[in-house]
């Protein structure tokens, strides 16, 4: 049993859902029991209405295939992977399939899911209502993701989390060019990043924008491009062009034109 399975299990058990955890390993069963979650033997799965596959993405097809050979068609299969289509659960007629992907980083099974969002996808109206009820009881906000656009949705999720870490790495490299050690650089940048996220939360994308782009300060931007490491400058250009779009009509035409010239992709 992994961290997400534990977190979902605890959240739903608190709301009196009849949760059972099935794990192939003694270690997984012991982890579930240590959290106060009840475990299920393979035979118990035949009585389940909904089975959530909280397994690594690569394991979903094989696990779904193994379950499909033993479960009645009345048991719905639901994976928790962000990028996988429902076809990863098999294509047997008569079985409801769905996905339930919480948009949160779960570092411990005891982490609260309250306030996060979950992406739900299923062609079954009945299963959709069950998953929405499940989300509400876990304190999750629901968005529905069309199956055809799952890759774009998941890419956006990755950009907001792993992409943010990569952006922090680039910022640390920029401070490194000024002679600041990586540990000190990250410690200096984290409060700034937190304040930027708070501004984003309270004022939205355009309102949360700060820095030389929104001020139209092409001189500062030119100095930045001159000083940045060669592998960071292209990222700075790309993100600054996005910032130009967010700045909108707050920039005077002459300032915008000067920035656009500076921010053209090099080469």
Descriptions of predicted regions:
Residues 1-47:
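NAD(P)+-binding Rossmann beta1-loop-alpha1 motif at the extreme N-terminus of oxidoreductases
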Residues 18-20, 96, 141:
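Residues at the starts of beta-strands that form the adenosine-phosphate
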Residues 18-23, 77-80, 118:
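Short, hydrophobic beta-strand segments that form beta-sheet elements in well-ordered domains
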Residues 26-29, 39-111:
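Rossmann-like NAD(P)(H) cofactor-binding subdomain of soluble oxidoreductases
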Residues 31, 104, 250-267:
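Short, basic/aromatic-enriched C-terminal tail that caps enzymatic domains
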Residues 31-33, 94, 111-202:
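Internal alpha-helical scaffold of NAD(P)-dependent oxidoreductase catalytic cores
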Residues 198-255, 267:
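Interdomain hinge/lid region at the active-site interface
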